Amino acid sequence: MARALGAEVTVGISYKDGKVTKDSSALTIKGISAAKKSLTLSELHTGESGLLTRMMIPLISMIGPGKVHITGEKTLTRRPLKGAKEIMGAFGVGLVPDEAHESEEVFVPLTVEGCVNAGKTEVSGSGGSQLISGLLMALPFAEEDTVIHLKDPKSIPYLFITMDVLKAFGVKVWCDMEGDKEFAESQDWNDCTGMTLHIKGGQKYVAAEMDIEGDWSSASNFLVAGAVFGRVDLKGLDTRSLQADLSIMDILMEAGASLSQLGDDDPKGDIHVQRAPLSAFEVDANNCPDLFPIISVLAAFCQGTSKIGGVGRLANKESDRGKAILDMLLQMGVKAKISGDKMIIEGHSLAQRQLTGKMLRGGSYTSNHDHRMVMALKVAELGADSPIVIDDTDCVTKSFPTFFELFGKIINK
């Protein structure tokens, strides 16, 4: 994507303290000194990434020529961009899909028309944080200041990650959070009812050096595998992270997992998890929907009835993920149902399943071309009565190309 926008990207070279060194994990990007309407491209391809699409819509409407065609592929073209038309319309930008749909939502491919207007605007955050993050990235290029009042915000931690990254590149954005007395006492994201985002206009991005954190979403699959079936040690994670999926640690602790971090108060110390008796848990996953598949598998091995909120956030993922998870659990022989916005799962400990012979059912399963479902299925296979055969495993490369290699190493230890 950086190259498509005109940036120069060098892989395997690091520049630090005036020295050039080889580093296979490094990316060096020479930017394009973007400014309002400085970009001349007419078409942008975002692959299968909903995140990239939603972030790029505000950006290219700000720095693009005023009319840019966005294309995608595979599941992206079947997934509605919930709330995008309404939100971008509030900023004076039109989204025109190539084909008409019965839904009021828009789909890729589409054309982005117009330039983002600064000012005071109120929009809904119920569709998620990705488009809002794109606006936070784009609006510093505007001449005037912007204030966005976000009603019913979701995936709030991701907005704080965006603001943290912007700060690293010299851009000032800040927010006020709203909620009732319960929020004031709990400071729980799920109790927040609104946010007011303040973006100064006329800003410029400055080059910066960044270390990319380990990904808690990917790590969650290994943590659950260790908590249920054996032991796992993970390196490269930061327990001070703003990532929403750090919540997996709280969920595992509530379930009774044996967790520890090596090092004297070192937030980047190795994470150790090992098998322990697990009990049912209750969690609101509205702010960490990517954890839903793997914590559903976790719930199947927790004694008692677990309740996971946030099913409504799953409809427009790579699959209708709520339905896909429920179908997977039922096929495995797990008692589960969706009630309102919650998934209710009747679990049994691994020890009880082994004692009674009621392991999860193996066999042929569909991933629904969803990378997170593939990873959850592979973890579930560890507690199945026969191998689980997944129809499409290639989709896992979207977020974790080396998943099978690393997972295999852990299983063989």
Please report, for each region that a protein language model flagged, where it lies by residue:
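Short, structured segments at the rim of ligand-binding sites
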Residues: 1-413
